[in-house]
Every structure is written in C-alpha cells, then in structure tokens.
C-alpha cells in the first residue's frame, strides 16, 4: 500500500484556493467547498486500494439538502436536563419559573380575555403569543432541535453535536450554596462527554450547548463560596465547546443569541401579518422607558433617564417596573408601550443586555442604546453591522453628567431617517424570534434558532479546515 503523501494533498488544496479566488463565492460556500476539496485531496493521496468511506444520501432522487447541515443531539441522562425541571418546585430559586415551562418553554398562552384590549395590541387569534420567561431559552432550544429538519441519530453523518444540558437551571438552583454543589453537575457532564465516541472526533470543538443565562454565571474565577456562579466554562472540556447564551463575555467560544420574546409564530405569513400591523401603528410618544431605577448601582444612568422622561411633558412614556402593579410582567402592557413609541430607551440594567431590547424591536420601536455592550458587541449574527441603520447610540457619560438632553437629541432625528430606521427594525423581527417547532417548506422562517445553528455549522467547518 502506498503511503499518505502530504505534498500531493497540499498541491490539491492550493489549486482549490486559486479556484475560490477566481469565482468570489459567499463565505459559507467557501468553507463548504474547501472542506470538500480537502476530502478529495486526502483521497488522491491514498493508494487505489485505500478509499474513504463517504456516504452520500439522496432525497427523492435528488441531492441531500441536509449535506453539511446534519446535527446530532446527545441523549443525555435525565439528570442533566429533565430532572432539573421535574424537581423545579423543590428549589426555592426556581419556584417562580416553574409555571413558564409549559408549551415547550414558551409558557402559558396569552388569551383574549386576559385584557379588554388584547386584540388591539396583539394578533391574539393566531394563538402565538405567550407569557414567555426570559430565562427559558435552553428548554425552547432543545424542543426546536427535536424538530430540526437535519437532525440525525447517526453521529457519523453529523457536522456538529448539540448538548441539551440545562446549564441555567443547574446554576440557578444552587444560588448562594457552596462551590462544590454548584460545580458538581457540570464536572459530571464533562466526564460523561469525554467518554463518548463523538468526543474523540474533535475533542469538543464540534460540540455546542445553549443557556438562558448570561455568560458570567459560568465563569467563576475563584473557589470561594462568596464568588459568583459556577466554573462550567473554565473546565478544560468546556473551553473547547461553543456556548450560546443571552449575553456573552466576548470569549472566543461564546456567542450571544436573542432573549426569547412573547411572540412565537408558526409561519412566514403570520410574521408578515405582524410586520404590517407594526408598520401601521400610530405612535403617540417620541420615546419611552420600561424599567426600574437602580439607586444602589452608582454607575447606573437609569435615574437620570427616568428624570428626563418624566420632565418631557408627555413626549415620553415611563412604565415603572419598581412597583407592586406587576405591569412589566404583563406582555400586553409592555408591548403596548413599545407600539406607542417611536424610540425605546435601553440602558444597561444588572448586566449590559436586556430582554426589553428584543420586545421593543418586535413592536417596531427604534432602540436607543447607551452602551456598546448592550447589542453591538453581542448579537453580531442578528443585527446589521452599521448600527446607525436601526438604532441610536448615546454615550452613557454625557447622560450621567446631565450634558445630554435625550428628548432634544431624538426630536432632531428627521422623519425621513425615522422611516428608514423603522423599516430596518421591521426587517430584523423574523431574525430575533423563536418560532413554533416543526414548520418546513416555503412557510418556514429563518428565525433566531435557525440562524444560530447555521453559524455554529460555519464555525465548526472553519475548525475542520484548520485541522487538515
């Protein structure tokens, strides 16, 4: 048998790169093409007696539409997911989240009788509006993956491996407990993954998981009980795994995906209908703020934002989340405020990002950011690179010192520019929602889930090319 010839493989790859330069393909095509060429190069470097075991699947006589898109989902022991939500009521820190687990993590459905004006605010007759909790993403994502059109039970066909670990529920249930308890399940999972044959393929670099918490919850620096969170993402195994979370620490293996909103449509037609409703809204307020003050946070600008809003003589709507009315937990009231506003203020809260950002965009309201970490440095897969197309940025420092009048600044934005920005915001809507699982064909939407999976596939393809 002839020996493997690396020089011959290198020559083939050089020719492939020349072809790619000449045809100027899209980035995704380039990655998949290079991967294919690398396989051919390896094949040519072997003797006639040694061939690759390549399986090409077809559908109804045509090419396989899932080629390069297959995902294998680990069948984890129930202690890593199902048991965590079955025992929800047993943990004080989780009890107020239990009611949101129904309907595949979307929560209870919003009904017409919940408000006398629900039908004016929401497209309620479609049955696609829910009381969705912002931390339910891992449950939602797992259910979506179960219906993913390119899910396979044959890991040899898969391009990536999904790990359906409910990391957020795990870290939350032991909030304030000792670090041994907080770290135990993550370390158990790391060992379980190491022992799987799928792990040895790329030692985790083709694995990913999703969490409904912020990234810092999984990067505890010390082993002091007083320190925050657990150390899941500091384990050697998880340094290779890609984590998708609602907010990242800008690490190379962390990527931000949208917070869940209240809207989970089934079809493209339904989304377009909602976009038309958003376009036709008559907006009474120049700007609005839905949130609470943060008096104990010295760096917070929320107090100044609330002061300016209340002083605007009716041009700003403030929905106070620091009261016992629970209005901010009511999707109808929250969405109604955003529908009535041209601009929606999105200052940082406990962390730089906010679920409110996505609720306001859903309502067609132009977001106003005060920190680059609220969206621009986070959700790069979902928003235009040019932030001026869809948002307004006001530096925190000027607001904090009282040097910036938010009202005057926003009032100076021309009607023409507002129209362009709103049009861009409405285009973003399908990208930041999580649709009902199972839709295929022309009515299928490239939602937040589909975009995330596609980007993970691209990322793993790049890893594979660098290993060749």
Swiss-Prot record:
Positions annotated with a glycan in the UniProt record: 53, 116, 153, 240, 412
Any one GO MF annotation of this record: glycosyltransferase activity
Membrane topology, record value: Single-pass type II membrane protein
Top enzyme class: transferase
Organism superkingdom: Eukaryota
Location of the protein in the cell: Golgi apparatus membrane
E.C. number: 2.4.1.-
Disulfide pattern: none
Membrane topology (Lumenal): 36-468
InterPro entries for the chain: Exostosin, Exostosin_GT47
Listed name of the protein: Probable xyloglucan galactosyltransferase GT13
Lineage of source species: Eukaryota, Viridiplantae, Streptophyta, Embryophyta, Tracheophyta
